[in-house]
Amino acid sequence: MSILNHFFDYKPEVLALDEKAMELCQPYFRHMEEIRDFNQLKMLKAFADTQMSSTDMLGTTGYGLWDTGRAKLEQIFAEVMGAEDALVRSQFQSGTHTLAVALFGLLRAGDTLLAATGRPYDTLEGVIGLDGKGKGTGTLMDYGVQYDEAPLKADFTPDYDLIAKKAPGAKVCHIQRSRGYLQRNAFDLETIRKIADTARAANPDIIIFVDNCYGELTQTQEPCQVGADIAVGSLIKNPGGGIAPTGGYIVGRKDLVELCAYRLNAPGLGKELGCTLETPRDMYLGFYYAPGVVCEAIKTAIYAQCMLELLGKNPVPRYCDDHNDIVTCFDAGTADALIGFCQGIQAASPVDSYAAPEPSPEPGYTDEVVMASGSFTQGSTIELSCDGPLREPYTCYLQGGLNFAASRAGVLLAIQKAYFKD
């Protein structure tokens, strides 16, 4: 009997698929483990270089002045991310909030934001003010910032000619590394480099801005090492390692990070303020563990992609592709299959496993959405979770997985509930 059936009741045909998928995935697992090992040693070196000590994890209150633990954590982030400086704070509430702080920090009235990888995902539309969203609430457009975009081509690749044409009039060139709700692969670092080179050749002063959410530590380099001036992400995604309870980061050129700090705090205060309370230990530990956790999440993605491909689905990316974020998307085919898949993920979660996700209206979505997230941290996407809108072709987005053993069980249960019903 498979060890899996000691704890969950899987059908023989599901276990047969599992056996085949595990065999096919081994070389791709080993590749990710090599990336993990490189990044873990890079992480260890950064911790040692800062001479981080146990007292740095104690936290501060009030203003947070002279917080050496906060300063050392930011130094570690900067070194690991290949940047001059970093702003790593628990005061960032989400990835969207962190992105908003960075954009407002860099852009002024009359400046133009160029979205070089097409329209950003939904939550940023309200920050920018696209299509009148959030009008009068303090969007970038409310403050006189202009918006332009270079849509992706039909094959979801950047339109470099259009980027070169539009870059001279822009202050910031925005690159979204992950797919959002498009069925495309995440952009690899060479693509980010080429976008940066193209925009900078047309406008040497343009600021290359990368939304790095879901992409951290998936490769051995980061965007600031391939031409980005600033990169932004969330600590309840990859770099928090499933341990950081909240927060975000901004890394990049020192002068630009300082501008972002003025926006987060106040002009004249910059990085000097911001108490850490009881968060430093979790933020240090989460970042230290992040290379291993990201590896487990991508192994989960590779395995899920292989299983889905064996079932005749067409996941993006494929299990044999290079992986530049932790997200998998595929067309479930029917509403029942999408709901069943989400219910299987939830049933094999450590938190709220007894819940059965059902479609419901969600703010910002035109269709009902079904979501599964049995996570320790609310909204965490480095923990195994999935979601999808109830509209054809019933696309499901799967991400995360703190450890492969448990995530494998979840994927199997999801596939069984979706495609092997009695």
Segments and roles (model prediction):
Residues 3-26, 33, 42-56, 65, ...:
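Conserved PLP-enzyme active-site core in the AAT-like
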